[in-house]
Amino acid sequence: MIPGEIIVKNTEIEVNKHHPETVIEVKNTGDRPIQVGSHFHFFEANKALEFDREKAYGKHLDIPAGAAVRFEPGDEKKVQLVEYSGRRKIYGFRGLVDGDIDEERVFRPNDSNQNAAVKNDAGEDNANKKGGK
């Protein structure tokens, strides 16, 4: 062992385990690349990103902290979102919430809407899980 060395288990890291997921289709209609970070309130993402914003209210990307998803001009891809946890307050970003999340606006997936939600993590099929690309 080397002084200061950290030895960890060689296992997969589970991100946002037991958080219900919502999958939405996103298209960059702008002329420049757009990146959205792991903790950004997706509802408030760049206006050039076209998607069902109401389904994104109160949610962020289901990716590891510090990662991001990049949308090149014209890109269209599915992303997986999860609800914020903790105190459920959102401040900053584009200033559209600045306080408590309005629970009545939060889309919660159910079995009757298979296009908006998945029961289990989509793993490698999920665009956001591919190294932030």
UniProtKB/Swiss-Prot annotation:
GO cellular component: a single term: urease complex
Biological-process GO terms, alphabetical: urea catabolic process
Catalytic activity annotation: urea + 2 H2O + H(+) = hydrogencarbonate + 2 NH4(+)
Major subcellular site: cytoplasm
GO MF assignments: urease activity
Enzyme class, spelled out: hydrolase
EC numbers: 3.5.1.5
Alphabetical list of Gene3D superfamilies matching this protein: Urease, beta subunit (2.10.150.10)
Ranges for region Disordered: 106-133
Keyword Hydrolase among record annotations: yes
One Pfam family cited in the UniProt record for this chain: Urease_beta
Cited InterPro entries: Urease_beta-like, Urease_betasu_sf, Urease_subunit
Alphabetic keyword roster: Cytoplasm, Hydrolase
Entries under NCBIfam families matching the protein: PRK13203.1, urease_beta
Quaternary organization: Heterotrimer of UreA (gamma), UreB (beta) and UreC (alpha) subunits. Three heterotrimers associate to form the active enzyme.
Family of this protein: Belongs to the urease beta subunit family.
Protein name according to UniProt: Urease subunit beta
Organism field: Staphylococcus epidermidis (strain ATCC 35984 / DSM 28319 / BCRC 17069 / CCUG 31568 / BM 3577 / RP62A)
Name of the gene: ureB
